[in-house]
A protein has these predicted regions:
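Metal-dependent phosphoester-hydrolase catalytic domains
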Residues: 31-35, 40-41, 97-136, 194, ...
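Bacterial Sec-dependent N-terminal signal peptides
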Residues: 1-19, 520
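Surface-exposed intrinsically disordered loops and tails
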Residues: 61-102, 243-244, 283-302, 356-368, ...
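C-terminal outer-membrane/trafficking sorting elements
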Residues: 439-528
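N-terminal, active-site-proximal structural segment of metallo-dependent hydrolase catalytic domains
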Residues: 93, 122-225, 285-313, 324-326, ...
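Structured beta-strand-rich core segments of catalytic domains in phosphoester-bond hydrolases
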Residues: 191-193, 197, 201-280
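Active-site-proximal beta-strand/loop segments in catalytic clefts of secreted hydrolases
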Residues: 156-163, 188-192, 216-221, 230-232, ...
Length: 528
Protein backbone atom coordinates (compact mmCIF):
# COMPACT_ATOMS: atom_id res chain seq x y z
CA UNK A 1 0.00 0.00 0.00
CA UNK A 2 2.85 2.34 0.88
CA UNK A 3 4.58 1.60 -2.44
CA UNK A 4 1.34 2.33 -4.35
CA UNK A 5 0.95 5.65 -2.53
CA UNK A 6 4.53 6.65 -3.32
CA UNK A 7 3.98 5.74 -6.99
CA UNK A 8 0.82 7.86 -7.12
CA UNK A 9 2.63 10.84 -5.54
CA UNK A 10 5.43 10.41 -8.10
CA UNK A 11 2.98 10.43 -11.02
CA UNK A 12 0.81 13.24 -9.66
CA UNK A 13 2.63 16.13 -11.47
CA UNK A 14 2.33 14.34 -14.79
CA UNK A 15 -1.35 13.68 -14.23
CA UNK A 16 -2.03 17.25 -13.20
CA UNK A 17 -0.17 18.84 -16.10
CA UNK A 18 -0.78 16.30 -18.88
CA UNK A 19 -1.74 17.63 -22.28
CA UNK A 20 -5.48 17.64 -22.76
CA UNK A 21 -6.77 16.39 -26.11
CA UNK A 22 -9.46 18.67 -27.51
CA UNK A 23 -11.38 19.39 -30.69
CA UNK A 24 -11.61 22.83 -32.27
CA UNK A 25 -13.98 24.63 -32.22
CA UNK A 26 -16.28 22.33 -30.19
CA UNK A 27 -14.23 22.39 -26.97
CA UNK A 28 -13.41 26.11 -27.10
CA UNK A 29 -16.83 27.57 -26.33
CA UNK A 30 -16.10 28.37 -22.65
CA UNK A 31 -13.04 29.47 -20.67
CA UNK A 32 -12.49 25.97 -19.24
CA UNK A 33 -9.24 25.46 -21.16
CA UNK A 34 -7.64 28.72 -20.04
CA UNK A 35 -4.04 28.15 -18.95
CA UNK A 36 -3.98 24.49 -19.98
CA UNK A 37 -1.69 22.78 -22.45
CA UNK A 38 -3.85 21.23 -25.13
CA UNK A 39 -3.45 19.10 -28.24
CA UNK A 40 -6.05 19.79 -30.90
CA UNK A 41 -6.80 16.38 -32.41
CA UNK A 42 -8.61 17.48 -35.58
CA UNK A 43 -6.60 18.73 -38.55
CA UNK A 44 -6.63 22.52 -38.89
CA UNK A 45 -6.19 24.71 -41.97
CA UNK A 46 -4.10 27.87 -42.11
CA UNK A 47 -6.54 30.61 -43.12
CA UNK A 48 -4.75 33.87 -42.25
CA UNK A 49 -1.00 34.44 -42.51
CA UNK A 50 -1.13 38.24 -42.62
CA UNK A 51 0.71 38.64 -39.28
CA UNK A 52 3.07 35.71 -39.61
CA UNK A 53 6.10 38.05 -39.58
CA UNK A 54 4.95 39.21 -36.13
CA UNK A 55 4.68 35.69 -34.80
CA UNK A 56 1.00 34.83 -35.19
CA UNK A 57 -1.28 33.09 -37.66
CA UNK A 58 -4.93 32.02 -37.74
CA UNK A 59 -6.09 28.43 -38.08
CA UNK A 60 -9.59 27.08 -38.76
CA UNK A 61 -11.45 23.82 -38.98
CA UNK A 62 -11.28 23.69 -42.78
CA UNK A 63 -10.98 26.55 -45.30
CA UNK A 64 -12.87 29.81 -44.90
CA UNK A 65 -14.83 30.77 -48.00
CA UNK A 66 -16.04 34.22 -48.93
CA UNK A 67 -19.82 33.77 -48.37
CA UNK A 68 -20.83 34.40 -52.00
CA UNK A 69 -18.22 31.97 -53.31
CA UNK A 70 -20.39 29.06 -52.17
CA UNK A 71 -23.80 30.64 -51.52
CA UNK A 72 -26.27 32.78 -53.43
CA UNK A 73 -26.26 36.43 -52.33
CA UNK A 74 -28.56 37.47 -49.50
CA UNK A 75 -28.37 39.63 -46.39
CA UNK A 76 -29.33 36.85 -43.99
CA UNK A 77 -26.97 34.36 -45.63
CA UNK A 78 -24.12 36.87 -45.63
CA UNK A 79 -24.47 37.66 -41.94
CA UNK A 80 -24.79 34.00 -40.99
CA UNK A 81 -21.76 32.83 -43.01
CA UNK A 82 -19.64 35.68 -41.70
CA UNK A 83 -20.50 34.69 -38.14
CA UNK A 84 -19.61 31.06 -38.90
CA UNK A 85 -16.26 32.18 -40.29
CA UNK A 86 -15.58 34.39 -37.27
CA UNK A 87 -16.39 31.56 -34.85
CA UNK A 88 -14.15 29.17 -36.78
CA UNK A 89 -10.84 30.93 -36.11
CA UNK A 90 -8.15 30.51 -33.50
CA UNK A 91 -5.02 32.62 -33.24
CA UNK A 92 -1.76 30.72 -32.81
CA UNK A 93 1.42 32.35 -31.50
CA UNK A 94 4.71 30.76 -32.41
CA UNK A 95 6.52 31.05 -29.07
CA UNK A 96 9.96 29.53 -29.64
CA UNK A 97 8.82 27.56 -32.70
CA UNK A 98 8.77 29.14 -36.15
CA UNK A 99 5.82 28.80 -38.52
CA UNK A 100 7.94 29.16 -41.63
CA UNK A 101 9.28 26.37 -43.80
CA UNK A 102 12.68 26.09 -45.48
CA UNK A 103 11.56 28.72 -48.02
CA UNK A 104 10.71 31.24 -45.34
CA UNK A 105 6.97 31.15 -45.93
CA UNK A 106 3.77 29.77 -44.48
CA UNK A 107 0.89 29.49 -46.92
CA UNK A 108 -2.87 29.74 -46.72
CA UNK A 109 -4.30 26.27 -47.31
CA UNK A 110 -1.57 24.41 -45.44
CA UNK A 111 -2.81 21.99 -42.80
CA UNK A 112 -1.49 20.90 -39.41
CA UNK A 113 -2.44 17.93 -37.24
CA UNK A 114 -1.96 17.48 -33.49
CA UNK A 115 -1.28 21.15 -32.82
CA UNK A 116 0.00 21.47 -29.24
CA UNK A 117 0.28 24.59 -27.11
CA UNK A 118 -0.91 26.51 -24.09
CA UNK A 119 -4.41 27.95 -24.33
CA UNK A 120 -5.14 31.45 -23.05
CA UNK A 121 -8.60 33.03 -22.96
CA UNK A 122 -9.35 36.75 -23.28
CA UNK A 123 -12.35 38.78 -24.45
CA UNK A 124 -14.22 35.64 -25.47
CA UNK A 125 -11.42 34.36 -27.73
CA UNK A 126 -8.69 31.77 -27.36
CA UNK A 127 -5.04 32.03 -28.33
CA UNK A 128 -2.69 29.06 -28.50
CA UNK A 129 1.03 29.53 -27.82
CA UNK A 130 3.00 26.66 -29.28
CA UNK A 131 4.83 24.26 -26.96
CA UNK A 132 5.67 21.82 -29.74
CA UNK A 133 6.89 22.48 -33.27
CA UNK A 134 4.01 22.17 -35.76
CA UNK A 135 4.35 20.07 -38.90
CA UNK A 136 2.57 21.82 -41.76
CA UNK A 137 1.44 19.78 -44.77
CA UNK A 138 -0.16 20.36 -48.20
CA UNK A 139 -0.25 23.35 -50.54
CA UNK A 140 3.48 23.56 -51.08
CA UNK A 141 4.83 26.22 -53.39
CA UNK A 142 4.31 25.18 -57.04
CA UNK A 143 7.34 25.30 -59.31
CA UNK A 144 6.01 24.46 -62.75
CA UNK A 145 2.60 24.51 -64.38
CA UNK A 146 1.90 21.30 -66.30
CA UNK A 147 -0.76 18.59 -66.46
CA UNK A 148 -0.73 14.94 -67.50
CA UNK A 149 -3.49 15.36 -70.07
CA UNK A 150 -2.51 16.01 -73.67
CA UNK A 151 -2.94 19.61 -74.83
CA UNK A 152 -1.55 21.87 -77.54
CA UNK A 153 -2.36 25.33 -76.18
CA UNK A 154 -1.89 26.96 -72.78
CA UNK A 155 -3.54 30.28 -71.91
CA UNK A 156 -2.69 32.22 -68.76
CA UNK A 157 -4.91 35.05 -67.50
CA UNK A 158 -3.23 37.16 -64.86
CA UNK A 159 -3.86 40.41 -62.97
CA UNK A 160 -0.29 41.69 -62.53
CA UNK A 161 -1.27 44.38 -59.98
CA UNK A 162 -0.43 47.79 -61.41
CA UNK A 163 2.53 46.97 -63.63
CA UNK A 164 4.15 50.27 -64.69
CA UNK A 165 7.58 49.01 -65.73
CA UNK A 166 9.32 51.21 -63.16
CA UNK A 167 10.01 48.71 -60.37
CA UNK A 168 12.90 46.31 -60.99
CA UNK A 169 11.78 43.89 -58.29
CA UNK A 170 8.24 43.74 -59.68
CA UNK A 171 9.55 43.17 -63.20
CA UNK A 172 11.84 40.36 -62.06
CA UNK A 173 9.11 38.61 -60.08
CA UNK A 174 6.42 38.93 -62.77
CA UNK A 175 8.79 37.67 -65.47
CA UNK A 176 9.77 34.73 -63.26
CA UNK A 177 6.08 33.81 -63.01
CA UNK A 178 5.46 34.15 -66.76
CA UNK A 179 8.52 32.06 -67.53
CA UNK A 180 7.49 29.33 -65.08
CA UNK A 181 3.99 29.09 -66.55
CA UNK A 182 5.39 28.86 -70.11
CA UNK A 183 2.14 29.85 -71.84
CA UNK A 184 1.35 30.30 -75.50
CA UNK A 185 -0.82 33.32 -74.67
CA UNK A 186 -0.65 35.62 -71.65
CA UNK A 187 -3.86 37.60 -71.09
CA UNK A 188 -2.74 40.32 -68.69
CA UNK A 189 -4.57 42.94 -66.62
CA UNK A 190 -3.46 46.15 -64.89
CA UNK A 191 -0.59 46.84 -67.29
CA UNK A 192 -0.19 50.63 -67.55
CA UNK A 193 -0.16 51.43 -71.25
CA UNK A 194 1.76 50.15 -74.26
CA UNK A 195 5.11 51.36 -72.92
CA UNK A 196 4.76 49.16 -69.82
CA UNK A 197 3.60 46.28 -72.00
CA UNK A 198 6.69 46.66 -74.18
CA UNK A 199 8.86 46.74 -71.05
CA UNK A 200 7.37 43.49 -69.77
CA UNK A 201 7.54 41.69 -73.12
CA UNK A 202 11.17 42.74 -73.61
CA UNK A 203 12.07 41.51 -70.13
CA UNK A 204 10.38 38.16 -70.80
CA UNK A 205 12.32 37.69 -74.04
CA UNK A 206 15.55 38.58 -72.26
CA UNK A 207 14.89 36.12 -69.44
CA UNK A 208 14.09 33.36 -71.94
CA UNK A 209 16.98 34.31 -74.25
CA UNK A 210 14.67 34.56 -77.23
CA UNK A 211 12.71 37.03 -79.30
CA UNK A 212 9.66 34.81 -79.77
CA UNK A 213 7.34 36.74 -77.45
CA UNK A 214 5.35 39.54 -79.09
CA UNK A 215 2.61 41.80 -77.83
CA UNK A 216 -0.52 43.44 -79.21
CA UNK A 217 -0.85 47.16 -78.56
CA UNK A 218 -3.96 48.40 -76.81
CA UNK A 219 -3.64 51.90 -75.36
CA UNK A 220 -1.06 54.66 -74.90
CA UNK A 221 -2.90 55.94 -71.81
CA UNK A 222 -1.04 55.68 -68.52
CA UNK A 223 -3.67 53.59 -66.76
CA UNK A 224 -4.41 49.94 -66.20
CA UNK A 225 -5.42 48.07 -69.34
CA UNK A 226 -6.01 44.54 -70.61
CA UNK A 227 -3.46 43.22 -73.09
CA UNK A 228 -1.88 40.17 -74.71
CA UNK A 229 1.64 38.78 -74.94
CA UNK A 230 1.92 35.68 -77.14
CA UNK A 231 4.48 33.13 -78.30
CA UNK A 232 4.94 33.85 -82.00
CA UNK A 233 6.43 30.38 -82.52
CA UNK A 234 3.13 28.72 -81.64
CA UNK A 235 0.30 31.17 -82.41
CA UNK A 236 -0.47 34.00 -84.82
CA UNK A 237 -2.99 36.80 -84.16
CA UNK A 238 -5.87 36.90 -86.65
CA UNK A 239 -7.21 40.33 -87.59
CA UNK A 240 -7.26 43.32 -85.23
CA UNK A 241 -7.81 43.60 -81.49
CA UNK A 242 -11.47 44.32 -80.66
CA UNK A 243 -12.71 46.41 -77.71
CA UNK A 244 -16.03 45.91 -75.99
CA UNK A 245 -17.71 49.32 -76.12
CA UNK A 246 -21.14 47.95 -75.28
CA UNK A 247 -20.55 48.87 -71.61
CA UNK A 248 -18.52 51.99 -72.34
CA UNK A 249 -17.41 54.36 -69.61
CA UNK A 250 -14.35 56.44 -70.42
CA UNK A 251 -11.23 54.28 -70.56
CA UNK A 252 -13.00 51.04 -69.62
CA UNK A 253 -13.04 49.58 -73.17
CA UNK A 254 -9.26 49.23 -72.70
CA UNK A 255 -10.12 46.72 -69.97
CA UNK A 256 -12.48 44.56 -72.05
CA UNK A 257 -10.91 43.24 -75.25
CA UNK A 258 -10.88 40.24 -77.59
CA UNK A 259 -8.32 38.79 -79.99
CA UNK A 260 -8.36 35.71 -82.21
CA UNK A 261 -5.30 33.49 -82.55
CA UNK A 262 -4.48 30.77 -85.06
CA UNK A 263 -2.56 27.78 -83.73
CA UNK A 264 0.35 27.23 -86.11
CA UNK A 265 0.46 23.47 -85.54
CA UNK A 266 -2.92 22.85 -87.19
CA UNK A 267 -4.28 26.27 -88.31
CA UNK A 268 -7.15 26.01 -85.82
CA UNK A 269 -8.50 29.30 -84.51
CA UNK A 270 -10.00 30.45 -81.24
CA UNK A 271 -10.78 33.76 -79.53
CA UNK A 272 -9.66 35.07 -76.14
CA UNK A 273 -12.07 37.56 -74.56
CA UNK A 274 -10.23 39.28 -71.70
CA UNK A 275 -12.08 41.30 -69.07
CA UNK A 276 -11.46 43.45 -66.00
CA UNK A 277 -14.80 44.40 -64.49
CA UNK A 278 -15.71 47.11 -62.01
CA UNK A 279 -14.24 46.64 -58.53
CA UNK A 280 -16.28 46.32 -55.32
CA UNK A 281 -14.70 49.58 -54.10
CA UNK A 282 -16.90 51.46 -51.64
CA UNK A 283 -14.60 54.41 -50.96
CA UNK A 284 -16.30 57.19 -52.92
CA UNK A 285 -19.71 58.59 -53.79
CA UNK A 286 -21.80 56.58 -56.19
CA UNK A 287 -25.42 56.45 -57.44
CA UNK A 288 -27.82 54.71 -55.07
CA UNK A 289 -28.30 51.79 -57.46
CA UNK A 290 -24.59 50.95 -57.11
CA UNK A 291 -24.53 51.01 -53.29
CA UNK A 292 -23.66 47.96 -51.21
CA UNK A 293 -26.94 46.30 -50.19
CA UNK A 294 -25.32 44.02 -47.62
CA UNK A 295 -26.06 40.83 -49.58
CA UNK A 296 -22.36 39.94 -49.92
CA UNK A 297 -21.74 41.27 -53.43
CA UNK A 298 -20.31 44.65 -52.42
CA UNK A 299 -20.72 47.90 -54.31
CA UNK A 300 -21.38 48.30 -58.04
CA UNK A 301 -22.89 44.83 -58.54
CA UNK A 302 -25.44 46.26 -60.99
CA UNK A 303 -22.55 47.69 -62.98
CA UNK A 304 -20.88 44.28 -63.12
CA UNK A 305 -24.16 42.69 -64.19
CA UNK A 306 -24.30 45.15 -67.09
CA UNK A 307 -20.72 44.23 -67.97
CA UNK A 308 -21.66 40.54 -67.96
CA UNK A 309 -24.62 41.19 -70.25
CA UNK A 310 -22.42 43.29 -72.53
CA UNK A 311 -19.88 40.46 -72.64
CA UNK A 312 -22.52 38.05 -73.94
CA UNK A 313 -23.39 40.53 -76.69
CA UNK A 314 -19.72 41.17 -77.41
CA UNK A 315 -19.16 37.44 -77.95
CA UNK A 316 -21.73 37.49 -80.75
CA UNK A 317 -19.91 40.40 -82.37
CA UNK A 318 -16.40 38.95 -82.19
CA UNK A 319 -17.39 35.46 -83.34
CA UNK A 320 -18.73 37.04 -86.52
CA UNK A 321 -15.71 39.32 -86.95
CA UNK A 322 -13.12 36.61 -86.28
CA UNK A 323 -15.16 33.90 -88.05
CA UNK A 324 -14.93 31.33 -85.29
CA UNK A 325 -17.19 30.07 -82.52
CA UNK A 326 -14.52 28.93 -80.02
CA UNK A 327 -14.29 31.62 -77.33
CA UNK A 328 -12.41 31.60 -74.02
CA UNK A 329 -13.64 34.28 -71.60
CA UNK A 330 -11.11 35.07 -68.86
CA UNK A 331 -10.09 37.82 -66.48
CA UNK A 332 -10.63 39.49 -63.12
CA UNK A 333 -14.41 39.82 -62.99
CA UNK A 334 -14.45 41.14 -59.40
CA UNK A 335 -17.31 38.73 -58.71
CA UNK A 336 -17.31 35.54 -56.65
CA UNK A 337 -18.70 32.34 -58.09
CA UNK A 338 -22.31 32.61 -56.85
CA UNK A 339 -22.76 36.32 -57.47
CA UNK A 340 -25.18 37.79 -60.01
CA UNK A 341 -22.65 38.70 -62.76
CA UNK A 342 -21.26 35.16 -62.84
CA UNK A 343 -24.76 33.70 -63.02
CA UNK A 344 -25.48 35.97 -66.00
CA UNK A 345 -22.61 34.30 -67.86
CA UNK A 346 -23.73 30.82 -66.83
CA UNK A 347 -27.33 31.54 -67.81
CA UNK A 348 -25.91 32.76 -71.12
CA UNK A 349 -24.80 29.13 -71.60
CA UNK A 350 -21.10 29.71 -71.05
CA UNK A 351 -19.31 26.89 -69.22
CA UNK A 352 -17.54 27.76 -65.97
CA UNK A 353 -14.28 25.84 -66.34
CA UNK A 354 -12.99 26.42 -62.80
CA UNK A 355 -16.24 25.16 -61.29
CA UNK A 356 -16.02 22.21 -63.64
CA UNK A 357 -12.48 21.20 -62.73
CA UNK A 358 -11.46 22.77 -59.39
CA UNK A 359 -14.50 24.18 -57.55
CA UNK A 360 -12.74 24.09 -54.16
CA UNK A 361 -9.73 26.20 -55.05
CA UNK A 362 -9.42 30.00 -55.23
CA UNK A 363 -7.64 32.91 -56.88
CA UNK A 364 -7.92 35.56 -54.18
CA UNK A 365 -7.84 35.96 -50.39
CA UNK A 366 -9.25 39.01 -48.66
CA UNK A 367 -9.79 40.18 -45.07
CA UNK A 368 -13.33 41.39 -44.52
CA UNK A 369 -15.90 41.13 -41.73
CA UNK A 370 -13.22 39.92 -39.29
CA UNK A 371 -12.11 36.92 -41.30
CA UNK A 372 -9.62 36.22 -44.08
CA UNK A 373 -11.60 34.28 -46.67
CA UNK A 374 -10.95 32.93 -50.16
CA UNK A 375 -12.76 32.57 -53.48
CA UNK A 376 -12.60 33.11 -57.23
CA UNK A 377 -12.52 36.70 -58.47
CA UNK A 378 -10.65 35.48 -61.56
CA UNK A 379 -12.44 33.13 -63.93
CA UNK A 380 -12.25 30.96 -67.04
CA UNK A 381 -15.40 30.46 -69.14
CA UNK A 382 -15.85 28.87 -72.56
CA UNK A 383 -18.45 28.62 -75.27
CA UNK A 384 -19.86 25.13 -75.74
CA UNK A 385 -17.72 24.38 -78.79
CA UNK A 386 -14.49 25.33 -77.02
CA UNK A 387 -15.47 23.58 -73.79
CA UNK A 388 -15.27 20.25 -75.63
CA UNK A 389 -11.62 21.02 -76.35
CA UNK A 390 -10.55 22.20 -72.89
CA UNK A 391 -8.57 19.64 -70.92
CA UNK A 392 -8.15 21.44 -67.59
CA UNK A 393 -8.24 24.82 -65.87
CA UNK A 394 -6.89 25.80 -62.47
CA UNK A 395 -5.27 28.61 -60.47
CA UNK A 396 -1.47 28.67 -60.20
CA UNK A 397 -1.07 29.14 -56.44
CA UNK A 398 1.84 31.58 -56.27
CA UNK A 399 0.27 34.75 -54.84
CA UNK A 400 -2.95 34.71 -52.83
CA UNK A 401 -1.61 31.85 -50.69
CA UNK A 402 1.56 33.71 -49.68
CA UNK A 403 1.94 36.13 -46.73
CA UNK A 404 1.23 39.77 -47.52
CA UNK A 405 4.62 40.66 -46.01
CA UNK A 406 6.32 39.04 -49.01
CA UNK A 407 4.62 41.34 -51.52
CA UNK A 408 6.59 43.76 -53.67
CA UNK A 409 7.95 46.42 -51.34
CA UNK A 410 7.72 44.12 -48.33
CA UNK A 411 10.48 42.42 -46.37
CA UNK A 412 12.20 40.10 -46.97
CA UNK A 413 12.20 40.83 -50.73
CA UNK A 414 13.23 37.92 -52.94
CA UNK A 415 13.58 37.76 -56.72
CA UNK A 416 11.34 34.69 -57.13
CA UNK A 417 7.81 34.58 -58.54
CA UNK A 418 5.99 34.15 -55.22
CA UNK A 419 3.71 37.03 -54.16
CA UNK A 420 4.45 38.91 -57.38
CA UNK A 421 0.79 40.03 -57.36
CA UNK A 422 -2.27 39.71 -55.14
CA UNK A 423 -4.15 37.42 -57.57
CA UNK A 424 -3.33 33.84 -58.53
CA UNK A 425 -3.03 33.43 -62.32
CA UNK A 426 -5.61 31.19 -64.00
CA UNK A 427 -4.24 28.61 -66.44
CA UNK A 428 -6.44 26.98 -69.10
CA UNK A 429 -5.17 23.98 -71.07
CA UNK A 430 -6.72 23.36 -74.49
CA UNK A 431 -6.44 20.64 -77.13
CA UNK A 432 -7.51 22.95 -79.93
CA UNK A 433 -9.00 21.26 -82.96
CA UNK A 434 -9.84 18.00 -81.21
CA UNK A 435 -13.61 18.07 -81.44
CA UNK A 436 -16.61 20.29 -81.93
CA UNK A 437 -19.01 17.37 -81.86
CA UNK A 438 -18.98 17.27 -85.68
CA UNK A 439 -16.65 15.38 -87.94
CA UNK A 440 -14.69 17.39 -90.47
CA UNK A 441 -14.88 16.74 -94.22
CA UNK A 442 -12.78 13.83 -95.48
CA UNK A 443 -12.81 11.27 -98.26
CA UNK A 444 -15.58 9.40 -96.44
CA UNK A 445 -17.70 12.48 -95.81
CA UNK A 446 -19.39 14.88 -98.20
CA UNK A 447 -17.63 18.15 -98.95
CA UNK A 448 -20.07 21.03 -99.13
CA UNK A 449 -19.94 24.12 -101.29
CA UNK A 450 -22.03 27.16 -100.35
CA UNK A 451 -23.55 29.18 -103.19
CA UNK A 452 -25.53 32.41 -103.04
CA UNK A 453 -25.79 35.62 -101.05
CA UNK A 454 -27.37 35.17 -97.60
CA UNK A 455 -28.73 38.73 -97.82
CA UNK A 456 -31.17 37.34 -100.38
CA UNK A 457 -32.62 35.12 -97.67
CA UNK A 458 -31.24 31.71 -98.66
CA UNK A 459 -28.11 29.70 -99.44
CA UNK A 460 -27.69 26.71 -101.71
CA UNK A 461 -25.64 23.75 -100.49
CA UNK A 462 -23.96 21.56 -103.09
CA UNK A 463 -22.31 18.18 -102.39
CA UNK A 464 -19.34 16.93 -104.41
CA UNK A 465 -20.23 13.26 -103.84
CA UNK A 466 -22.74 10.99 -105.60
CA UNK A 467 -24.93 10.82 -102.52
CA UNK A 468 -27.92 13.09 -102.01
CA UNK A 469 -28.23 15.56 -99.15
CA UNK A 470 -31.03 14.81 -96.69
CA UNK A 471 -30.79 17.26 -93.80
CA UNK A 472 -29.18 20.55 -92.77
CA UNK A 473 -28.92 21.90 -89.22
CA UNK A 474 -27.93 25.44 -88.22
CA UNK A 475 -26.08 25.55 -84.89
CA UNK A 476 -25.29 28.68 -82.85
CA UNK A 477 -22.04 29.30 -80.95
CA UNK A 478 -23.49 27.68 -77.83
CA UNK A 479 -23.93 24.38 -79.69
CA UNK A 480 -27.74 24.63 -79.91
CA UNK A 481 -29.63 23.68 -83.05
CA UNK A 482 -31.67 26.76 -83.89
CA UNK A 483 -33.02 25.56 -87.26
CA UNK A 484 -33.27 22.21 -89.06
CA UNK A 485 -34.45 21.46 -92.59
CA UNK A 486 -35.15 18.04 -94.16
CA UNK A 487 -35.90 17.02 -97.73
CA UNK A 488 -39.56 16.14 -98.20
CA UNK A 489 -38.85 13.07 -100.31
CA UNK A 490 -37.18 10.07 -98.62
CA UNK A 491 -36.03 8.92 -102.03
CA UNK A 492 -34.35 12.23 -102.79
CA UNK A 493 -31.45 12.04 -105.25
CA UNK A 494 -30.54 15.72 -105.32
CA UNK A 495 -27.00 16.78 -104.48
CA UNK A 496 -28.06 20.33 -103.72
CA UNK A 497 -30.17 21.78 -100.94
CA UNK A 498 -31.81 25.20 -100.61
CA UNK A 499 -31.47 26.54 -97.08
CA UNK A 500 -33.57 29.52 -95.86
CA UNK A 501 -31.61 31.93 -93.63
CA UNK A 502 -33.76 35.06 -93.77
CA UNK A 503 -34.99 34.72 -90.18
CA UNK A 504 -31.51 34.40 -88.69
CA UNK A 505 -29.72 37.26 -86.95
CA UNK A 506 -26.33 38.46 -88.13
CA UNK A 507 -23.44 36.49 -86.71
CA UNK A 508 -21.44 33.28 -86.81
CA UNK A 509 -23.03 29.83 -87.25
CA UNK A 510 -22.08 26.22 -87.83
CA UNK A 511 -23.89 24.29 -90.52
CA UNK A 512 -24.27 20.50 -90.16
CA UNK A 513 -25.10 18.70 -93.38
CA UNK A 514 -26.10 15.01 -93.69
CA UNK A 515 -26.26 12.71 -96.72
CA UNK A 516 -28.36 9.58 -97.38
CA UNK A 517 -25.88 7.42 -95.43
CA UNK A 518 -26.24 9.71 -92.39
CA UNK A 519 -22.69 10.95 -92.83
CA UNK A 520 -22.13 14.45 -91.50
CA UNK A 521 -19.86 17.36 -92.23
CA UNK A 522 -19.75 20.98 -91.14
CA UNK A 523 -19.44 24.39 -92.74
CA UNK A 524 -18.77 27.73 -91.10
CA UNK A 525 -21.24 30.47 -92.03
CA UNK A 526 -21.06 34.18 -91.25
CA UNK A 527 -24.29 36.05 -91.91
CA UNK A 528 -23.76 39.78 -92.58
Amino acid sequence: MKRQLLLFIHLLPALLFAQQEVIFPDDFKTNALDGKEVTITNTLTLTNNYSYAYGSITLSDGPLWTPTEKNLPGVEMFNQKNKENQDNQITVKQGVYSFTDANGTCRIGQTVAKLTGTASYSNGKYTITLTKKPEFQCNERPITCEIEEDYNLKVVSFNVENYKGTNDVQRTKIVAALKAMDADIYALLEVFGNSSLNDLCTALNTACRTDQYKYIENSTANQGMACFIYNSNTVTPFRDLQKNKLADNGYLPDRKIAQAFDLKANNERFIVCLNHWKAKDNSYNKPDEYADTGDGQGSHVLRRVHEAEATLEFIKTVTAYFEDEDVLIVGDLNSYSKEDPIRVLEEGELINELQKYVPNEYSYAFFSNNSYATGYLDHSFATATLDAQIRYAHPFHINADEPDALKIGGKPQEDNMYRCSDHNPIVTFIKLGTTTGIESPSSSHPTIQLIGDPRNGYLTLVSNTDLALTRAEIVNIDGKIIAAHDTNNAGNTEKHFTLPVKSLACGFYLLRVYDTQSRCTTCKVVLP
